[in-house]
Structures are given as structure tokens and as C-alpha cells.
């Protein structure tokens, strides 16, 4: 634990001058005519209906081994998105040695949210032009569009236009991700669907019907958890670091998505590997995973933002909700507020 603490203390901090120059794009949208992708409608409809049936089977006939297996796979796929596609390959918040990259690529294939290369390109674009027409899942268009609707229609022309301006050279030249992209169909088909179905059947005698539909439930549930970061975490929650943007702090999303719901912080400081001011907590399992990998020697150059810069940014652009205190005499309590507080039946000195 001492080594882990030392690792966290040695993470890089961002210069104050850099933090002050960050300007976020204001949310906006313009009217558009949607061009629907009907094959996606059919695919998503079947997958969600089958997943609901899988949920029913979880409570009626599935073996406990299958449920435990699916629970473990869910967290593995979560890590493949949060630690792999998101914090490592999109935002470069830390560096990973080859064994960790391979593990995260396999976990990412288990999640099947396109290839990691495509995921990173769209997510970099999302941050660069957040909640505008150049954002693939523009939350200014509402909950449904930012949750799943954006996958059911053709991309906005601005997404295609500005997507070409995003530097993706590091991701395109990553040999692990090039391998995933080259063999995407057999790799993802095997890791995400075939093995999660075959293992329960042949290892503990689960029925084919249960194994397949519960595998789909695990996949669709994980998919919607990620979608909630794009939708719910851009609509509901407080904004302690920048009140001018849509991303907000959403504890429920953080719980489900292994720490990805501290979204107002993340959009202000996307280079922080913790994605939260208080990254080391039970809601942020991804940070704990990265810290463990750093202790193990597989992750290094973990980047974080200094406490002073966080406080300065919150004071300058936040909605005031960062000043949470435990009560009277908390060291963070505003002195002016304290001096002007009403005190009834005050004891006379």
C-alpha cells in the first residue's frame, strides 16, 4: 500500500497557466433532418428484447454460477471501456506496458462498443466539441438522442467534418489496437458472445437458452451503463467546476460505470487519470484498478491535477457546489458567510 501511495504522489500535475487557458465550447444545436439506419433499429430492438428475456431468466432458471460469471464479465467489460478505451487510449491519462494493453484490449473486445480506435476517435471529438453538432452524441438534442438515438441515424455533417481534424496518429499506430481492428469480427464475436455462451454450457451445465440470453443481458446492460455517461451525466447533477457546460456530477452513473459519472470534473480536466477530484473511493473502481496496475508495474506516468488548480477553477467557473463542508468550523467554510451567520440565544461572554 505504501508503494501504491507513493505511486499516486508521484503522478504528474498540470501547470496553473495551462488550466487557466482551457476554454470549453458552449452547448448548442441546430435543427436537422434525420436519416435513419433501419438495420441498427432492428439490431438494437432484438438485442434489448432478448436482454430483457435474459434478465427474466436470471430470476427464474439460471444457475448461480452463470450469474456470478456474468457479474465478473460485466466488470471486466466495464474496465475495458473505462480504463482502456477511455482513460488510456482516448485521453492518455496514463501509460500502459504491453501486458496491460493486451488485457485491456481483450476486456474492451468483451464490451463490444465498436473497436477501441473508433471509440477513441468519437470520444475525442465529443470532448473537443461537446454538446454541439460536431459531438457524435450531442446532449443538447435530449436524453434519448444522446443515450442511443445517435446510433440510429446518420451522423451530422459536422461530426464528419470536424472528425477529420482530430489527431489520431497515436491510436492508429498502436499495434495492439491495430490488431483488434484487423481481426474485429472474429475477435469480438468470440470474446463478447461465443465464449460467454459456451463456458456456462460446457463448464457447469447451463442451458443454451439461458447462456445465450444472459450473455446478451450482460452485454446490453454494460452498453446502457456507458450510454448513461453520455445522457444522464450530461443532464442531471451539480456542476462544481464549470457551470457553463452540460456535463454534471452524477453519483448513480459513477456507481454503475465504475467512476465515470464525475462528469463535470472530467470535462474540465480530461487528462486526470482519476476523472474525479476524489478519485480514490468505492465509486471509482477504475481508478483503484489503475492504481493497482501502477503498483504492479504495468501502468506508469499517471497524470492528475493539483488541489490548488482544482480549487481555483471551481471558484472561477463552478456553480458553488464544490464548497461542501461537514458543518461549523470546517476549514473550508467561507469566512464571510461565517461572520454574517445568525446565532440565536448566543452565550454572553
Curated annotation (Swiss-Prot):
Topologically, how does it sit relative to the membrane?
Multi-pass membrane protein
> EC number(s) in its UniProt entry?
1.14.19.5
Q: Where is this motif: Histidine box-2?
A: 123-127
Mind telling me which CDD domains this protein's record contains? Delta9-FADS-like (cd03505)
Kindly list the biological process annotations in GO that this record carries.
unsaturated fatty acid biosynthetic process
Cofactor requirement: Fe cation
Say which family it is in: Belongs to the fatty acid desaturase type 1 family.
Name this protein carries in UniProt: Acyl-CoA Delta(11) desaturase
Q: Which organism is it from?
A: Trichoplusia ni
